Amino acid sequence: MKLKLSLLALLCSAGSVMAESAPKNIIYMIGDGMGPAYTTAYRYFKDDPNTKVVDPTVFDTILRGMAHTYPDDHTYVTDSAAGATALSSGHKSYNGAIAVDTDKKPVKTMLEVAKERGMTTALVATSQINHATPASFASHNESRRNYDEIANDYIDNKIAGKLPVDLMLGGGTKYYVREDRNLVEEFKAAGYQYSDDFAAMNDLKQVPALGLFAEVGLPFALDENPTRLTQMTTKALDLLDGQNDKGFFVMIEGSQIDWCGHANDIACAMG
């Protein structure tokens, strides 16, 4: 009994310390599809062949643990949607699910919690901004393939009377400027700054803002501008820093790590 009470006291005190030291800002970085095979390949890619020891990489220094990633369906390998739903909400679901459970009911995401708490919210991705991973933080849909519906969610859904995402940087003009609806104009009407020119991204001076720099996904880093994600991340943090006394939440995805894997292109993946 004494051991149990001591453990309870320890947990309670730890909870108190954690509550007192909760971070003001949250930066959530995701390498889509980036399993152990990628980090191993990167270790060999970066290694100095003139030494006998395989040198550790930055990923080796920050590794804190691993988790099972199987979805809640009859398959063994997760997809980006089920994986991102688990990461954003803590709920396992079926492959293709966008922040819904196995009954296709919405589950609350950490971005939505942040918005409810008055924080500024942001999504940055090298895919279209309504692709599976970013979508699973700010939308709810039974299928990741419903790209138009997901894009609509970003302006139709309200959290505490406000749009869910204050800053979005990525691709996706194909889904935002359509024959049936022009979401870009709707975002502008809602007070968002807008840019579709990556070279002019710095013209975005404040949030809310929307930057769509490709029709679908951005060019692969191997082919064009290898620092594009770094530049978008830097811009996002510049816009978010100090903007809100309650802090910010931003999800940043290296989307095309996964796309290179699907293509079985090791050079693309390491780029």
Put a short name on every predicted segment:
Residues 1-19:
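Gram-negative bacterial Sec-dependent N-terminal signal peptides
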Residues 24-34, 114, 212, 247-258:
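Beta-strand elements within well-structured catalytic alpha/beta cores of enzymes
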Residues 108, 220-226, 233, 238-243:
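Cysteine endopeptidase catalytic domains of the caspase/legumain-like
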Residues 132-138, 216-224, 244-271:
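Active-site His/acidic residue clusters
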Residues 163-167, 187, 195-197, 201-212, ...:
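Active-site regions of oxyanion-processing enzymes, predominantly non-cytosolic
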